[in-house]
Amino acid sequence: MIVVGAGLAGLNCALTLQDRGLSVTVLEAGDAVGGRVRTDVIDGYRCDRGFQLLNPSYPAVRRYVDLPALDLRSFAAGVAVAGDAGTTVVGDPRRQPGLIGRSLLSGFARPLELTRLAAWAAPALGPVSRLLDGPDMTLKESLDEAGVDGRIRREILEPFLAGVLASDDGSTSAKFVRLLVRSFLLGTPAVPADGMAALPEQLAGRLREPVRLGETVTAIESGPKVRTTAGEEPARAVVVATDPTTAGAVVRVRAPRMKGLRTYWFAADDAPRTDNLLVVDGRRDGPVVNTAVMTTAAPSYAPAGRQLIQATTLYPTEATESEVRIQLTRMYGRSAGAWEVVVRHDIAEALPDQLPPLEARQPVDLGDGLYVAGDHRDTASIQGALVSGRRAANTVAAALAG
């Protein structure tokens, strides 16, 4: 078996095939495993390639990942909303009951608005099968239909979701957003102490045959047969588990539109906040969709005595670094002018677009011994990537046994 691509989908596919007693070779064009889940270590700072979080409530994560070994560092179950009158903290009342009164009195979540928001989100806590049944619509249409409006929508929900979805136009599938809301309600997002790259590295470490790095696939032919920069590889089956654009170029699969994010990683002597909350801008008067002091949750992300702050915008963007610093200064109430840029990541293809109607289980068998896996075949998430990899592997195994 040959798996092309050592992202989460490819690695979980290879592990599933291996568990079924099959010999697997994983080819990866890059210099490390992970695909879009990578971490750059620069002068002692751990900068994930784009701000990413791991939600331990994902069923596939609980099933396939050794979570204790990742030494997860959790963010708080809430969000800090920067506004003209300062910053207001709005938390999950089930896990941070002390914030209930503050949330209600803040003006962001009046009782009627809370009731409407709860009614809109209610399907997220029911069976997933029921959540996925029925017609779909855009996020904007679903919020309008549910009467979710006011400051809770404009200053919290929409700014928060813009960073999660890599989109602020409300066009994302409402079903997909509710799936994400479900994961947020059931778990607290975190990062591994060694960076997000620790997740794919853990999966790759279980493979009996090491991933072959630096091998670019140039063609996939009937047989099936894979041509790479190192030569020709015959196989009983080939699973293409690359990014969607690459997959669309080498096999017969339609590549979805991809959405981008830009993340600045800043180093500072002092933390502008001492809690481990994600911060959004309720005023929405700048390019930053979210920011966080990574080292308040994960001190290992920076050298001792130093702080690491991420700031994320949509991409592409014409916003300058100066505009980002000005907005961060307003959001934190402390000057960001002297912060040092460790690195800036422009992720042009951060997430596949998830337009309605949501297609959560797209075909993985392309015929002639060719298969495809990736979050673009399931849902645009770590959960979707892991599930897709296993689904493709099971399909391969069934075909070989049949």
Task: Label the predicted regions.
Residues 178-229, 233-234:
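Helical element adjacent to the flavin cofactor pocket in flavoenzyme catalytic cores
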Residues 52-59, 131-137, 146, 182-204:
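Short beta-strand to alpha-helix junction loop
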Residues 38-57, 118-132:
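Glycine-rich active-site loop/strand segments that organize a redox cofactor
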Residues 218-322, 331:
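Mid-domain catalytic core of redox enzymes
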Residues 18-42:
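Glycine-rich FAD pyrophosphate-binding loop
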Residues 294, 299-402:
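Conserved flavin/dinucleotide-binding core of flavoenzymes
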